[in-house]
Amino acid sequence: MRLFSLIILWNFSLWFLAMNCAAEVQLTSPLQTVSAIPSHPGQNRFSILVWPYKTDILRDFELYRKLGIRGFQIDRGAGQEKKVEFSIKQNIPYYVGHAADKGFLHLTRNNRKAVTNQHGLVIRPHSLADPRTLAKMKDHLRRNVTATKKGRVLAYAFDDEISLGRMTNPCDVDIHPLSLQWFRKWLEKEYSSIERLNLQWETLYDGFDTVMPQSFEQVRKNTKKPLSRWNLSRWMDFRHFMDFQFAAVLSELVLYTNTLAPGIPAGFVGGQGPGPWGGYDYAMLCRAVQWMEAYDIHGTNEILRSWWNADRRLRMQTFFSSKNPKLDSWFLWYYMVHGNQAVIAWPEDWFHTGGGDIAPHILANKQTFKEIQGEISKYIVNPKTLSDPDPIGIYYSHPSIQAGWAMDAIVHGKTWIKRTGTLDNENQTMGVLRKVWCKTLEDLGFQYDFVSYLDVEEAKVNLNKRFRVIILPKTVCLSNKEADALREFVEKGGVLIADYLCGILDEHGKGRSQGVLDDLFGVVREESAGYMNGKGLTEIDGEKYKKPYLQRFTYYKNARRYKEIVVFERGTRDSRGANTLMENTLKKGRAVYLNLSPLEYWNHVRRFSIYGHEWRKIISDILSSSGLQPRVRVYENGNSPNMIETLWWKHNDKQYLCIVKNPTEKKELAKLGDAIEGITGQTVNILMKFPNPVELTNLRTMKQLGKGRDFHDHFNPWEANVYWVKDKTFQ
């Protein structure tokens, strides 16, 4: 009887806490966007913020000054009042880390083990659906924010490398009773009736109160079927919900922090790459927080730039020294001209090592540290300076990332649980493909923005107003709403490019007999012919992760190639019988189905060989026929392409051009082939050719290069050049 009473009391307590939590955390979609917070008035230059690893601002400040470093980190905050006072006295900025403490958003010790190597559904330690978890984090925030908010705080970070589980390692959390309750409520809003859910899931539930998700272990057994017969809905819906839960809790923590310290952005550091695990749906995360330091995995830096451009939310990178001064210099310049406002320096072996106060490889970049935090950075870091991309969109479909991961995991069988985030970072087909599309456009002299699938689904973006061309990278999952929006984009004059496997699954991961946009592209599929060499579906084989990149494509052997590029769908044809570069017109626009996989472009040898030339020509021809031309072409010692990226920024009526080296693999190489200087190479002469006459000034040297279309200058591959471009045609 006593046990029964305790169970009743426990359930009542959970219910009471859940009802109070419901008043704070958003429970159903669509996820609302937290308001942006303008940059700190003093944050108009790039900053290097030193993490306190084997160093301390109070002890080593003179060493920081010697290097020209102007920022630091306060860990947690409570009890760190001396550092706050020091910040005020020296007028030096800091960010606060672990403000919500460690162990809740980033699981530690035994709690981490509980979410590692699990095949089934798992209860997350410190469930984010449990109001007690939220209350504990808020208590830490209250103490840490109160102790630190009077100084020059740039931002508050809840924790580092946060995750639903452990980084982006696979684990199907969270079936805590309150999480399941929340999931069922969310499903009811998504599906509106149990009949619709049963039809989608192919189940026979009587009501939402008994609905259960499936783990990947349960659904993976069905991935051997033809794609048209796949149904990942019970797993993908659960993963989508957990991404929503993660973002909703972060959003609530942001709003709470804003009540404690209005005017200071709140977010997190150590962001992982997009994937089905850990809570890393960037379309949601970008709505949930006001700033982020995300590792640049699978294009996160450009994703954040795209969606945070209008309000210039704070973005940072972590700076790990390579101990090669040229590589370190390049890193700082690269991320500054890509719009990051700061880096967090991990100072291992920086200070008090090898018998000296400052390590030689760090001291070697003393002038770089000073310059990059000086006047030159104000042109880019100024919150009113905005990225100015070309009207090209790259589609971000998180359901496709989930389904793509399932395709990658086929080769692992039961050992999929050991596909760690580290392994996935190097072998995730969707992630590498995203980077390939970025590098392709950059090599052709273009910039772009990512398109959020949520914005399209919720009709929050006018596609034709923003884009002339939209690219769908292996967008295997599309909802009917998304398909309708993309169809309308074409009808109104847009150009839509899909590489392969477009729209074969719906947004929940359920197969269709034909792709939802097959009629738009004018293609017909014969699925029984298979893919690549006809023997598999996985592209980058994670079982071969120890082998060189180009040796991991198991099913490319004997696959058909078009101009050296692998043809993916063996049985897809258009009305003319063509199997590649299939094009269809609809009203004012057109749709192009490539049926090609350019993943090998990520290899630097392929990129700058005949393979890369042929791939770039295919894309260049489509863009050119769509009315797009690069705003400048840069030649290095007479060569183009040359691994030089051009970036455009605008500040009211002023236009800035940045150029920087843009590697994929092997960043340390001094030379690529016979003609292209690597980051660690030598100073080169460059020629910049503009289509229209402009007036050009090098803002680093303040040298006026005159007026005209062609300009010569010097370029150090381990740095960046920044120019002011006066162009009468600029609007």
Segments (PLM) and residue ranges:
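Bacterial N-terminal signal peptides
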Residues: 6-18
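Mature N-terminal, pre-catalytic/accessory segment of carbohydrate-active enzymes
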Residues: 11, 20-97, 104, 119-157, ...
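Extended substrate-binding grooves/exosites of carbohydrate-active enzymes
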Residues: 27, 49-50, 54, 94-138, ...
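Polysaccharide-binding and catalytic clefts of secreted carbohydrate-active enzymes
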Residues: 29, 121-294, 303, 456
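Hydrophobic faces of well-ordered beta-strands that scaffold small-molecule active sites
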Residues: 46-52, 71-74, 94-98, 154-158, ...
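A short, well-structured beta->alpha microelement
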Residues: 52-58, 74, 79, 271-277, ...
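Hydrophobic targeting/anchoring helices
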Residues: 114-121, 228-232, 248, 260-263, ...
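A conserved amphipathic helix/loop scaffold
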Residues: 473-730
